[in-house]
Amino acid sequence: MKTYIGTKIIQAEPAFRIDGEIYPESGPVPRSMNREEGYRVHYPDGYESWSPKDVFEQAYLPLTVNPDLRTDAPSISQQMVDDFILETWTQTMGDKTTVVRALLRNGFEIVESSACVSAENYDEKLGREICLGKIKDKVWFLLGFLLQTAVH
């Protein structure tokens, strides 16, 4: 059997699954001890499926339309970029270099550095801001690539 990687844009709504039946979160739901939270997933070809909440939220990012753009197509937003970065660590190396490591929500890590010419001018906070700007630019680029792949 071959292994594949895929990317597609889907629509989904929060729902519950009870005894194999899917109920929208917003509608009446029968009481049951076997109530599982998740999402009803709608694919572009009309296929529908169920995804458990934790699996869905790990695999999919919400897309929004940016009102400042001249299109109604979904796009990458600053919020998406910020939310994709789970955690960061900052370290000073030597007496004038800042290194920031960022852990992304998919487990990938990005490392950036900034430095100044003179140790007297070194400011870790400023170095961190510069590094985070570089990291966010890379995340924006990578999410843009992912969205373009899903569109085509």
Q: What is the meaning of each model-derived region?
A:
Residues 1-152:
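Motif-centric detector for short Cys/His coordination patterns
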